[in-house]
Each structure stands twice: as structure tokens, then as C-alpha cells.
Regions:
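Bacterial peptidoglycan biogenesis and beta-lactam-recognition machinery
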Residues: 384, 392-401
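Polar, S/T/G-rich
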Residues: 1-259, 341-369, 374-391, 413-422, ...
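Minor-groove-contacting beta-hairpin "wing" of winged helix-turn-helix DNA-binding domains
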Residues: 405-410
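Extracellular low-complexity, Gly/Ser/Thr-rich intrinsically disordered linkers
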Residues: 614-618, 622-630, 635-637, 641
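Extracellular jelly-roll beta-sandwich "head" domains, especially the C-terminal globular C1q domain
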Residues: 240-272, 277-365
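Short beta-strand-centered aromatic/proline hotspots
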Residues: 83-91, 637-647
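Hydrophobic beta-strand signal
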Residues: 74, 327, 632-633
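Glycine-centered tight beta-turn/hairpin loop motif at sheet-sheet or coil-to-beta transitions
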Residues: 78-80, 299, 634-637
Length: 661
């Protein structure tokens, strides 16, 4: 057995046994994907190993080995690559005040993924290819199609973050009425809508950031390509009524007197001229939001947010010295507009307060046309939790196939790719143990308990969340829960509240507000963009654009929990169990449980299912080729692997197997 750490071959004790546990899906915890790992073992404190671990025992050495980060590692058996992964240094054993041995553990690359992701969140990903200008052209394009320049990856779904939308074909006014009346005072306002990004692009960004590759027919599938995440980072609107978080840009003051540096666009401080205050005025349209920052020596001194024009805003400066400089910067809110800034500065010769001179400068108009930076709008969710939620929802298996490459497939597909191996000749068939599989008296599949108005009402009325599934069994076992870290939104097909109106409309929306009609944040919302809806003219709805014009609309995305806008074409849903779709108004049973979980759970609860334990002596060829999705044949009976404990030095193995049913 050979062990390599950060590319260097480590020394081993001659009598050291390294035992690996091989497991991916385990009946002891069916919601988790496991990775192969070793028992703890020791390495001698040899010259080679001391160099690898950089004399970790010596606290006086700087720049030493970082034990809280696992080191890249791989194991060879008789010069054949066995496993790639990471090695964790646990402790150094000392004897007579000298290092004797290093206690370590080895983990496969599946386990290492969580270390790689760390505490990073979705907004740490580079989604700049999906950034776009915040304007009517892009918003309207995204309502029923894709935003241009985003690689068909960004849409603007009909989900409201603040106002409770309804449809009243008689009433011409009323906050939230989206029926078209050629009146810009109500309807779907441009600032109501937030973008959504394809999950495939999030996966791509994860691969790029961490220099890994997911080899996955599942992630590349057409159905997965219809899944989007709503860019809902904070409760309320995306830009309107929100703190301005954009990075400010230097205001290029294009005219001014000699005290102002028109090349560097700043007020320099000299021995004879010390600024005491700055005042500024801004010309802007009434609806333009922006922030003015005053910087001293590249450090923000003060920030002020404004809407529309302002006059004579005073900023008193601290005592400055020669060599200091003052700059003005402007930050957009995201909703566009042009701002012209005029700046006036009083300069004093000394502390006596006698005015030496006054300096003025004026900008040309700076357009604050907002850009939607998609990463800034992503929900506050860890990358590891995002991947983990996908794994639990779709019962995915993540298996490393190379140092930075992972095979990601649903469990059933992964098992189907395994090889059947007859190992009867290597197994001690005279002695074995047989026991029942661990069973649970209740298995629950659930999303986050949403507080969005319709979802919470459904849960309170039915004692279970929309899309959740619960199964009870007559066993004296524990309860088991598979929980996904997303909100499963219950969408709404609007009904005309006018008694003589059109009745049930063709308009499908999401209401991301609470029962108290307050904005709601919750967990990230994912949904299918199942197709485009062309609505009858009698169901037309109103969009109020940035120019305060009411625009008649008949198109929108059908967003929801099913993968098609045509009932006969629905093959998948985001619900775990059978639910009535609020738009198509019929029940669909092709949910997550039936599609991705049912076969495994049904086999687990099959009356003939048993857990078998065998002892075996595996030759090198079998050890190296064995995969966790292989079927093992023993005396003409097939088994699937629950776990294998394998001594790499001796080839002795303890096989925990499930009979194939």
C-alpha cells in the first residue's frame, strides 16, 4: 500500500493496517450520500513525513502545515490507483518530547466536496454572464421569454414580493388589481418583478469557481433545464425601497476652478488650502434613486441616499493635512436615471476659519442606468446546502471518478450502471449473519415550512405542506425525515372577483407574501418554467413600465411545480406526492418520490429484504475494480452493497450486503 500526500509519497509503518469503509447509499440513513473513508491510522514521524507535515508539532515554526485544511491525497495498492481524496491530520504522538507518529484519516473526494465549498453562499458564485441592464426591454422580454444576452438563462416570473395580486375586471382601481384598464396607477409594476436564473447556470458557476466537473446526464437533461431559482435575496422589492448596495463610481467633475484637480477628479489638500465643508446639488428625475458618497483618501467618510433632485446638501469635513484628497462618488439604485452633480467647496487657509477661496465643479450628466448583478440577488444559501438539497430532492448519488470530476446521477440510474461480479470463490460462505433491514415507522419527505400565504394556508388546513409526503408503517421504529432546503411555492390561478366577469382566468402567479400581507423571504424558491402562456384578450393584464405607462399584456411564463404546460405531457413534478396542480387543475402523481425514491424505499420495505454480513478475502484485481454500485453474486444470489470494510494490506473484507429484490 502506498500513500501520497500533496503529491509526496509518505512513509508507512511496516505493520500498519489501513482499513477503508466503502459506502455510498446506506440503509442506516437513506437521506445521505456517503463517501468512502478510512479508519484512523498512524504514520511514522520519519524525515519524509516530518517534511510533509512541516514539523507540525513545533509551534515556533511559521508557515507550517495547516491541520484544519485536509490535504490532497491518494492511495495505491500494488501500484494500482485505489482511491483519491483528502487526508486529515488529527494529532501528533510524542515520545520523550520527540515526534513519534502522526494520526491521520483518509476521506474520498465525495466527503471533500463540503470542505471545498466551505461557508460560501450562492452570491459568492460568478453569474456575471447572466447580468443585464435593468430596463423595460429586458423585464418585458423576461415575462414571457428570456432576457437577451443571458444565454436563455434569465426570466422574469410573475411572482409578487410585496403586493397581493388579484383580478377584478370591473374595478378600475385598487392596489393589487392587475386587470388592464389603461391606467398606470395599478397592475403589475416593473419594480414588482424579480429575475430568476436557471439551475443549470448555478451548477456551471459552481464548477467554474471550484475547478470541478459534474459529469451528469441528469444536470444536462431537458427537464432539469426548465428549473429556475427566483432571485429573491431580501424581502420586498429588488431595488425599490431597498438600501442602495451598489458600488459607487467616481464622479468625474468635468469643469471647475484651479483648486479642483480635473484630471484625477478630486479636491487635493495642500498646505495653504484645507477644505472645511463640501456641499452638493443634484439634478435628477423625481423617481431616480441614487447614493452620493464622500471619500477621503479612498476611505468612505459619509454616504447619503436620495430620490430625485436635491439642493445644498452639506458635508462637514474633519481636519485634513497636505497630501490628503477628497472625492465624490455616485452609486445607482438599480432602477435607472440620469444625475447631474454640482459641487461647492469652502477652503480655509488655517484654523482661524478665514475663507481663502471657494471652489466649484460640475459634472456632466451621469447615467445611473441600473445593472442587475445576478449574484448580488441570489438567495442567502450556502453552496453546500444548495447541492445537498438537490441531492435529497432527486435522490442523487455523487461519486468521484477523478481528482476533480464527479459522476452525479439519480440512485436508480447509478445502480443500473454497475457491474455484476461473482465473488463466491473469495467469500467464506460457511459462516454469515442475516438480520432485518432497519425500518422506520414514519418516513417524511418535506420542503421548508413556508410562510407564503397560500402555502401556509394549505399546511394549516391539511396538516402537511403542499408537495410534502408522509408515509406511516406498522413498525416499532424511529421516524425518518428527508427535508429539502427550498420553498415549494403553491402558485395561484387568479379568478375574476367581479361576479359577472370571466370567472377563472388564465393568469398564473406566485404570491410571496405572508397571511398578514407582509413581504416574505423564506428559503430559496425553485420552480419549472413549463412554457409560454398566450392568454385570451378577455383575460388581459396590465404592466406599468418605467415611463409610468400602462401596457396591455397577454403573455407570461407558466411557472409552477410541473414540467409542462400541457396536462397530457406532464412527466415530472416538484411535489413529493400526488397534488392537484393549481393551473392545470388536475392531480399528477409523477412526483419526486415516485420518480426518484420509490424503487429504493419499496425494496427496503419488501418482506424478503435482509441484511447479510459475509467475510471475504479479496484479491488485488477485485479490490481495485470494485465499485459501490456493483452487484455481487454469491452462490447464485445477487446482492447490492450497503458497505464494505476492506483491509488494504491483507485484502480481508467484511461485506454488509442487501439481497437484490
Amino acid at each position: 500500500v502506498l500513500l501520497y500526500i500533496d503529491g509526496q509519497r509518505a512513509d508507512l509503518f511496516e505493520d500498519e493496517n489501513i482499513e477503508m469503509t466503502l459506502t455510498t447509499q446506506n440503509v442506516k440513513d437513506i437521506s445521505k450520500v456517503f463517501g468512502d473513508y478510512s479508519n484512523g491510522f498512524t504514520l511514522p514521524a520519519s524525515t519524509t513525513n516530518n517534511a510533509i507535515f512541516k514539523h507540525y508539532y513545533n509551534v515556533d515554526l511559521l508557515g507550517g502545515f495547516t491541520a484544519n485544511l485536509r490535504a490532497d491525497s491518494f492511495i495505491e495498492v500494488n501500484n494500482n490507483l485505489f482511491k483519491q481524496g483528502v487526508l486529515e491530520l488529527e494529532e501528533v504522538q510524542m515520545k520523550d518530547n520527540e515526534p513519534y507518529a502522526y494520526s491521520v484519516s483518509f476521506y474520498s473526494n465525495t466527503t471533500a466536496l463540503k470542505d471545498l465549498f466551505g461557508e460560501d453562499t450562492l452570491n459568492d458564485l460568478d453569474l456575471s454572464a447572466q447580468d443585464h441592464t435593468y430596463n423595460d426591454t429586458n423585464i418585458e422580454a423576461g415575462i414571457n421569454g428570456y432576457v437577451s444576452g443571458t444565454d436563455n438563462a434569465v426570466i422574469y416570473p410573475m411572482i409578487t414580493p410585496v403586493t397581493r395580486w388579484y383580478y377584478d375586471s370591473q374595478g378600475s382601481h385598487g392596489d393589487g388589481n392587475i386587470h388592464y384598464h389603461n391606467d398606470p396607477s395599478h397592475g403589475v409594476f416593473y419594480y414588482d418583478l424579480k429575475p430568476a436564473v436557471k439551475l443549470q447556470k448555478i451548477i456551471d458557476a459552481i464548477e467554474a469557481k471550484y475547478d470541478i466537473e459534474f459529469q451528469s446526464d441528469f444536470f444536462a437533461s431537458a427537464d432539469f433545464g426548465k428549473l429556475f431559482m427566483w432571485c429573491h435575496r431580501r424581502a420586498g422589492y429588488m431595488f425599490k425601497d431597498q438600501p442602495i448596495g451598489a458600488t459607487s463610481e467616481l464622479i468625474e467633475l468635468v469643469s471647475g476652478d484651479t483648486v479642483f484637480d480635473s484630471t484625477l477628479h478630486r479636491f487635493p489638500v495642500t498646505a495653504s488650502a484645507n477644505p472645511a465643508l463640501i456641499s452638493y446639488s443634484c439634478t435628477a428625475t423625481a423617481s431616480t434613486n441614487y447614493r452620493v458618497d464622500v471619500f477621503i483618501n479612498d476611505e468612505r467618510f459619509v454616504s447619503k441616499e436620495h430620490t430625485g433632485p436635491v439642493s445644498n446638501v452639506f458635508v462637514f469635513l474633519p481636519a485634513l493635512v497636505a497630501g490628503d484628497y477628497v472625492e465624490m462618488r455616485l452609486a445607482p439604485s438599480g432602477d435607472g436615471g440620469a444625475v447631474t452633480v454640482g459641487v461647492f467647496a469652502d477652503w480655509y487657509a488655517d484654523a482661524s476659519g478665514v475663507t481663502l477661496l471657494a471652489a466649484t465643479a460640475l459634472t456632466s450628466a451621469m447615467t445611473t442606468a441600473g445593472v442587475v448583478t445576478v449574484s448580488d440577488q441570489m438567495p442567502e444559501q450556502k453552496v453546500s446546502d444548495f447541492i445537498g438539497s438537490l441531492i435529497r430532492a432527486f435522490n442523487l448519488v455523487v461519486v468521484p471518478t477523478a481528482p476533480s470530476t464527479y459522476d452525479v446521477e439519480p440512485l436508480d440510474d447509478w445502480y443500473s450502471e454497475g457491474t455484476t461480479r461473482d465473488i463466491s470463490q473469495y467469500v467464506d460462505t460457511e459462516e454469515s449473519n442475516v438480520k432485518k433491514a432497519p425500518l422506520y415507522r414514519r418516513i417524511s419527505f418535506k420542503y421548508n415550512e413556508t410562510e407564503a400565504i397560500l402555502g401556509e394556508q394549505y399546511r394549516l388546513q391539511n396538516d402537511i405542506g403542499y408537495g410534502d409526503l408522509r408515509a406511516d408503517f406498522a413498525f416499532d421504529g424511529e421516524e425518518f425525515e428527508v427535508e429539502v432546503g427550498f420553498d415549494n411555492m403553491l402558485f395561484e390561478r387568479l379568478t375574476d372577483t367581479y361576479s359577472n366577469g370571466v370567472g377563472l382566468t388564465e393568469i398564473n402567479v406566485g404570491q410571496c407574501i405572508t397571511r398578514e400581507l407582509e413581504p416574505y423571504i423564506g428559503q430559496p424558491i425553485i420552480f419549472y418554467a413549463a412554457g409560454n402562456l398566450r392568454i385570451q384578450l378577455s383575460n388581459h393584464w396590465s404592466y406599468t413600465d418605467m415611463n409610468d405607462a400602462a401596457i396591455e399584456k397577454q403573455d407570461m411564463w407558466l411557472i409552477g411545480n410541473v414540467n409542462s404546460s400541457v396536462a397530457t405531457s406532464v412527466t415530472k413534478t416538484l411535489n413529493f406526492g400526488t397534488e392537484i396542480d393549481p393551473y392545470l387543475l388536475q392531480a399528477f402523481d409523477d412526483g419526486l418520490y415516485k420518480t426518484y425514491w420509490k424503487d429504493y424505499i419499496t425494496d427496503l420495505y419488501d418482506a424478503s429484504r435482509r441484511v447479510f454480513t459475509f467475510k471475504a478475502q479479496l484479491p488485488l484485481g477485485v479490490m481495485v475494480q470494485l465499485k459501490n454500485n456493483d452487484k455481487l453474486t454469491i452462490l447464485e444470489r445477487n446482492y447490492i452493497i450497503n458497505s464494505v470494510k476492506l483491509n488494504l494490506t491483507t485484502g480481508e473484507a467484511s461485506l454488509e450486503l442487501l439481497n437484490d429484490v
